[in-house]
């Protein structure tokens, strides 16, 4: 907690040239797990006071006076994400910070020059449209992006959110484009090393389903036929989608980083895209 910002802030302070980069950070919402997050602002909410306090703290840690993008890490209300299906026990609106208050607070940060824009994350179609509606009603700054998972094993964003991205000009910042590393191809071989993330984080069970592994083998064959790595196939597909405005890559080595970056120069052929869609039609969203 906070260390990533501290590391980047230390690097920025030594390097300078702040205007040469696009810098983003997030404010956490309330935890729905068993670990709790009361240590974050005494219980993380999206109230005006907490948004201002969290942003000021991030700016201090990052050694900068503005953020290019400030995101709500996940909704304050209860929603489905990380593989959860079925939605029961909706929160009472009286127990939640009004989205209008959240929108107004973020607009205040924009007007103060502390952030240049703000975005949403792990959001639903209802949540995105409600944020945009509140902005339109009040004339406040609107959200510019949604950071949600999107990859060959989880194309659920296409069901309701892709149209919103295109029609409302609120682009997808696609995270987990390699599906927790599954689409890197590394986890095709057994046994898994105990330090590999898929073994360490057992709570992310949606990535260890038989259908997911079956789909990976099919996509690996498509990549081989196209003469590229499985990771490059997966990343190039995400980048090619018209509603995607940023593909959030990750790497644990310089070799992986080079492989991922090279995917930006790959254009998938019509035959390759057809093969991808044929697999998706048979094994749809095995890791939602």
Model-found features: residue ranges?
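N-terminal binding-site loop/beta-alpha segment at the start of enzyme catalytic domains
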Residues: 1-27, 65, 111
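Short acidic capping loops at alpha-helix termini that bridge into adjacent secondary structure
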Residues: 18-21, 25, 65-69, 116-117, ...
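Structural motif corresponding to the early beta-alpha repeats
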Residues: 22-44, 73
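Active-site mouth loops of central-metabolism enzymes
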Residues: 37-52, 89-97
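Short, acidic/polar
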Residues: 47-61, 99, 103, 128-132
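Active-site groove signature of glycoside hydrolases
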Residues: 60-83
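Beta/alpha (TIM)-barrel catalytic core signal, keyed to glycine-rich beta->alpha loops juxtaposed to Asp/Glu
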Residues: 75-278
